[in-house]
Regions:
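ATP-dependent adenylation/nucleotidyltransferase module used to activate substrates
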Residues: 1-222, 320, 324
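Peripheral terminal appendages
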Residues: 1-26, 30-53, 83-93, 170, ...
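Secreted/luminal cysteine- and crosslink-motif detector
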Residues: 115, 156, 243-246, 334, ...
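Residue-level signal for mature regions of secreted extracellular proteins and peptides
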Residues: 148, 235-238, 326, 332
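Local cysteine-cluster metal-coordination motifs and their immediate loop/turn environment
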Residues: 154, 238-251
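Generic, ordered loop/turn and secondary-structure boundary motif
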Residues: 155-156, 209-212, 228-232, 254-257
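Class I S-adenosyl-L-methionine
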Residues: 211, 219, 234-236, 248
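Immediate flanking context of iron-sulfur cluster ligation sites
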Residues: 224-239
Length: 341
């Protein structure tokens, strides 16, 4: 890649003028769906097709989404066409690759390693509890005898980024289209609309970077494309994706208690099983409980298991009072104007 602003501009112009592949990432979330609709309705994708470009849609499967998201992606595929499923591949001994994926990127297999029989059996049991034929995140947790945390959030890199980078490596002169908005976080606000990514070996384009959430909702409404149904249930912080994320808010946790309690029960089982493997007490959430000595002096603050985090999510007054009658939050359908449908 030629250095400097001029070099980037020159390479960008070349990338756009020479036919290649446009990779549009779809997650089942509102922003990536809005990105596809925007590019389709603006005529960008059709123009690229006419110029000889290939448009590729892809979903990086963490194996940690809720069933509603997987069902929504199948529905979305009827509108956009083929969605390539990519994932990190962590095999058990003698285990055949799972069906339903277009690309599996080796993780442990790169070193010729496989999960031993007992750990592979544990992974399959947890996958069955999730209702998934294969879960990259579960496989990596079992393989490494650890869970991701806010301090060591390896989940994004190992279950989303690496498979997508593997897919990009198979494409020709790709432009990687990502549906993120500046309003989501300070980190995303600092990202440019266009950039060259050494990690991706491709240009990255964020077409709706300056959009508001209201614009995203309005595009869905105007296009007649329903959002992921999880948004209409409220979905805690208003975002869908890994459930739960290690960065889950109190609202996210409370929503899971109310709507997806089984997922929290399974996460509790995962904490317990991983604890048996590593001899410690791994905790998914960063919530801590103060431990005091007999004199009432603070001794330590220890992470709590998911069951206690779920109890805390239903409290008020800083966790001091159980909220038997928590104030009702406006349902997600209010923001989407779809409560009467």
């Amino acid at each position: 890649m030629t250095g400097g602003v001029a070099g980037k501009a020159q390479a960008l112009a070349a990338a756009i003028s020479h036919p290649g592949d446009v990779l549009v990432n779809l997650s089942g979330g509102k922003d990536s769906t809005a990105t596809w609709m925007h590019l389709e309705q603006s005529g960008f994708l059709q123009a690229k097709r006419e110029q000889g470009w290939r448009v590729v849609f892809a979903f990086a499967d963490t194996g940690w989404e809720l069933p509603e998201t997987y069902a929504y992606l199948e529905k979305l595929e009827k509108l956009v066409g083929k969605i390539h499923r990519v994932a990190t591949w962590v095999p058990g001994e003698g285990e055949a690759p799972p069906s339903g994926y277009d690309l599996l990127v080796p993780q442990w297999a790169t070193a010729g390693k496989c999960l031993p029989a007992d750990r592979a059996a544990l992974a399959r049991r947890l996958e069955a509890r999730l209702g998934r034929p294969y879960s990259p995140l579960v496989r990596l947790m079992v393989a490494w005898a650890n869970v991701p945390t806010t301090q060591r959030r390896w989940c994004t890199e190992d279950t989303k980024m690496k498979p997508l980078v593997g897919l990009l490596a198979t494409l020709n002169n790709p432009i990687n289209v990502i549906g993120v908005r500046a309003g989501e976080s300070a980190d995303r606000a600092a990202q440019p609309v266009w950039e060259w990514s050494e990690a991706h070996d491709a240009f990255v384009w964020r077409p709706i970077h300056d959009w508001t959430v209201e614009q995203v909702i309005e595009l869905h409404r105007a296009s007649g494309v329903d959002p992921n149904p999880l948004y209409l249930q409220g979905s805690g912080s208003g975002r869908v994706g890994c459930a739960p994320c290690v960065y889950a808010s109190k609202a996210d946790l409370r929503w899971l208690v109310q709507h997806q309690r089984l997922r929290l029960e399974i996460l509790g089982e995962i904490e317990e099983e991983i604890g048996k493997l590593n001899g410690r007490s791994p905790r998914w959430f960063s919530l801590r409980k103060v431990v005091e000595d007999s004199d009432g002096a603070r001794v330590a603050a220890v992470p709590v298991p998911v069951s206690q985090a779920a109890e805390w999510a239903q409290t008020q007054r800083g966790g001091r009072q159980l909220g038997l009658f928590l104030p009702e939050e406006a349902p997600g359908c209010v923001a989407w104007g779809m409560c009467q449908r």
